Every structure is written in structure tokens, then in C-alpha cells.
Amino acid sequence: MTRASVHTVNGEVNNMITAKMIIDRDYTLARTDEKLFCSFVEPLGRCIYGGLYEPGHPSADEKGFRRDVLDLIRPLNLTMNRFPGGNYTSTFRWEDSVGPKEKRPRRAEVAWQCIETNEFGLNEFADWSRLNGSDVMMTVNLATRGVLEAMDCVEYCNLEGGTYWSDLRRSHGYTAPHGYRYWCLSNEIDGPWQVGQSTGTNYGLLAREASKAMKLVDPDIKTVLAGSSSPDMPSFPDFDVDAMNAAWDQVDYLSVHNYISNLKGDTPNYLAKPLTTDRFFKQIGGLFSYIKAKNHSAHDLFISFDEFNTWHTVSGNERMEKPRWGIAPPLLEDTYTMEDAAALGSMLITILRNCDLVKIACMSELCNCISHIRTRTGGGCWVLPPYYAFLHYSRYGRGVVLIPRIDSPKYDSRDYSDVPYLDAVPVQNDDGTITVFAVNRSLTEKMTLRIELRGFEGDYTPNEWITMSHPDPKATNTEDRPANVSPRKGTADIEDGILCADLDPLSWNVIRLRRQK
């Protein structure tokens, strides 16, 4: 195993890390799907109420959407948002959320022990999504409802008119259909916390019939089968195998989720956890091959990674620690830090490194709850450090992912061995620019990164280097100090055709190489 080298400066011994990356034009993985750059919106805590939607706020438009929050969301260039859940979906009656607001019922939302007013519903989310230029991935309830209700929802959303549900939508002021193409068939059905938990076989049979019926209403839709809530679930992979075996030819994606946390305060181990995400993807890929062969099918499934993030309240029971049956109480509002930005950056790198399998990715969630966008009710809004990692990923991560050769020093942590200090992936953007995303996992040592290009025509020079770090791994941003942790420009050099950049300890980096004209 390669370890850090030692050099002397002014008589003092210091550790020095050097990592090398070779990028060859001919070693390509796959083109990134546009749906890798998505988010997730759920009526949980203050994600919607007091987050995206706050009538009476100084920045709110005529529909109650906070324009200051939209100004933070638009730069993310989200292609799609999953809605409305999430655990919320398991008792969701979609009909409650449409029509005149004064006639919508208030419901006990048992997943998060709150009252759902249904003031912000299906059509409000359609309006909001149009404002930020994103599509909607709709989730239907197969936990406590069934095939007919799922069909009705597709009819309401996607048919032009001439039927009961499509005409009802038109009467609600939406003449044109929403035309949603992607539909999740419930959520985390394997979880014991879920209302309507089921076995893989029983759920798979129901999902198969629901998908078949929904596609009879609109043959253009794609459906997402609910898979494992986490790679740590005792039911994984049996639940996934049984569900896919029952539904394989009728569905198009398998939904999987993964959150990582630092509950034990062990940052080196925390930064290695995306290795579990990588292994999870590869295990799912193996299951795909097995079920396809078992069913003698020509049909393929792909991964919909439609919930992922870092999440430090994941082991708590926050919903039960607060008074029940409130309206949009603050829930799961983690204080995200610089170390979370590096950990999330590695998760995003892992998604890109598996983009031949992963075709949908929705970071959870978009505002306040498990989110990097924070608001104060009646006041301002600001972003937390991981926001920038996703911003850069969405802005520069589109194109063809290349397969690099990486030589990096490694370390061992509590749960992992041979963890590379350098986590990185290159993407060739459509304009020819090569973007390298890189995380230095070392908490104490700078890393000299040497990048060699092979097989590319012309000379490439560093066009831009964005870096983000902070001496304190727990540093964050607040309303009073919104730029405490934020990106800055770095300087990279070319030596004998090899790019050299010094990456700060615990840093997120975006290095962009452009061919000289």
C-alpha cells in the first residue's frame, strides 16, 4: 500500500501526499443521463411550508412561492424533482391535494406525526417546477392504496381530456396535461417504519399490475420499482430479488436509497463511506444480470438513486421528540459542514463513476429538511457548504465519463481498509472541456495531484480550478456568515505537459482543462 512520503522544510519534517491520474481519451464509461441531476421534495418539516412556499413572505410571488429560495435553486439546473415522497407517500391520497384549497381536507400525516393541510398540492408543485425549469417524478401510493388509484393519478396528470379525471384537472385550471413521464411505484416498502410494509414478492406482484395498468393509460411513461431502503437493510438483497423477479418486464428502474452519517464523530471513516455506495451499485448491477437471465428476458433495468445525502439525525426519532400534530415543524434540519461537503462530493463522484448503471439520481431533500438550503420563516435564506458540491456537479458533470488510472496513497479506518486519499473522476463535457472532480480525504496533509492526458488532440491547459476547504472540518455557514465556507479560485500549473495542483486537506475541487485553439 502506498503511504505518504516525507520531506523537510526549514528543518521540520512534514508528510507530503502525491497522487497521480492518467486520463486516456479512449477509456470511456458512459454518457451521463440528464436525470442524474435531480432533487427530492416532500411535505416533511419545512421543506415546502416555510421553505419553497411561504405566502406573505416579502419575497413570495402571487402563488406564495419564495423567489429568494428559487434564486438559490435555479443555479442547480435541476432536471427533475421527485414528489411527494418519501414515507409521506404511504398514506397519501393524491385527490386531497387538488381542487380549491378551501375544500381540501386536513389529514393526520402519520409518517412524520404532523398535520398536512394540502394547501400545497399536486398542481402547485407543477407550477413551482415550471418556474425552475424542472420535470416531476411522481410517486404513487401502493402501500395503502392500489392499482385503480394509481391509474387515476396518471389519468389526471397526463391525459388531454375527455375523461373524468382529465376533465377534473381542466376544471381546476390546468387545460394542458402535466405529461409526467417518470413514476415511482411507492417508496421503501421493505422498511419496518413504513405504513404498508410488504414482502418483495407481494409488493412486486402489485407493482407489476400497477405499472401495467398505468402504462395502459399512458404508454409513454416509465416506472420505478421500489427497492432496498439501504444496503444495510436485513432484507437486502432478497427483497430486491423477489420484487424484480415478479415485476421485471413491466418496470424500467429500481429505486435504491443510501444515506451516510458521522454519528460516531470519526471523520476518516465517514469520508470512506461512499465506498459502500459504490459497492451497493455494483451489487445491484449483479442482481440485474441475475434476474434478467432468470427470466430469459431481453429487458433491462437501471438504477434510480432517488434518495441520497449525508444525514446525521438518521438514527434518532426526532419526529417523536417534538409535539405531535403540528403544521410543518422544523424536522431533520442538520447543520451541514465542510466535512459533509467532502463526503457528499465523494457520493457525487461515485454516481458519475457508475453512470452506466445509475440513470436517475435525486439528492434528498431540496430545502431545510436534510437539505443544504436553509431558510428562516419570514426572513432570509442561505446555503450550507455541500450546496456547492452539488452545484458544481450539476454544472460541470454532464458529458462522457472517462475511466482514469489513479495512483493514490491510502489509509485504513475503523470499517474500511485501503481507502484512497484521492477520490476523483473525469468528465469530458460536450464543448471538449475535461472536468476533474476531486476530493482530498486527508484531514491534515496537502495533496499534489498530477494529471496526465493521453490521446487527446491538441494541448490542454487549466482553464479553471474551483476549490473549497476550511481549517475546521465542522465549519458551516449561517444567516449571519453565509460565505464562511465557500468556493474560491485555485491556481494550477503545467509541467512538461502534466498538470500539477496542490489540493488542500479535506477539500472539494473542480479542475477544468480546455484545449488551446
Task: Identify the function of each model-found stretch.
Residues 257-272:
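Active-site His/acidic residue clusters
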Residues 10-239, 244-253, 277-278, 282-316, ...:
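Non-catalytic accessory regions flanking glycosidase/transglycosidase catalytic cores in CAZymes
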Residues 1-12:
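Short, positively charged and aromatic/hydrophobic N-terminal segments
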